[in-house]
């Protein structure tokens, strides 16, 4: 298996997170929603191990990468849409020749026809983990799963519950949901996302999108909820002792980036 990748999804990059990720051996991509500044030109010299990706909204709309976090941020095209657009079109083991169109403000030399297999961590910037070793341990423990996420992967039985009434899915159920603020996907999951976007010219809310499309493939794709991701939740007030006790988990949400620094001491 080729080296796994990390995609940090943010509106604007934060120097503390960039400093942290710049030391990693993973291939790290910073997916930036804001297009007011060329961040590659601004940061590439200082953070030479990071790849800064910016994509125009119109390109996402053209390829059907919309609605992924409209419920959360009230935008048709968000950083999540841009992340999935970039990785699904460039890294999903297809013959799609879209790489030259999706490399906007990046130093990445991406081959969309890659034959190597790897997984990608998609992480929002209010997600905390202690070190690169946290991800390496999870990768070593669960090498063969297509989707790792905090979900029980049980089909929804009441579409009047949760957010189902606000989510439009164009394939037949069953449907699934979970917390997807930090999740690891294989290229096969990315390909399922690309196929849906191409077919229906839109996607749907990420907390239903990833588990539903993965489970839709029946036995072809494998999903798992590791204990290490059960601390990725909608809302929780974490304290320092939580991380002292368990440095193997990934945590969400911790929105104050200065707390990330404190919690890593």
Where are these regions (language model features)?
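Active-site-proximal specificity loops/subdomain of glycosyltransferases
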Residues: 36-93, 117
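Short internal beta-strands
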Residues: 29-34
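Short beta-strand-to-loop acidic/aromatic patch adjacent to the donor-nucleotide binding site
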Residues: 117-128
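N-proximal low-complexity "stem/linker" segments adjacent to membrane-targeting elements
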Residues: 1-16
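Long, low-complexity Q/N-rich tracts
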Residues: 94-115
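C-terminal catalytic/acceptor-binding lobe
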Residues: 196-265
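Short, well-formed alpha-helical segments that are part of the catalytic scaffolds
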Residues: 13-25
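Conserved catalytic core of nucleotide-sugar-dependent glycosyltransferases
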Residues: 128-212
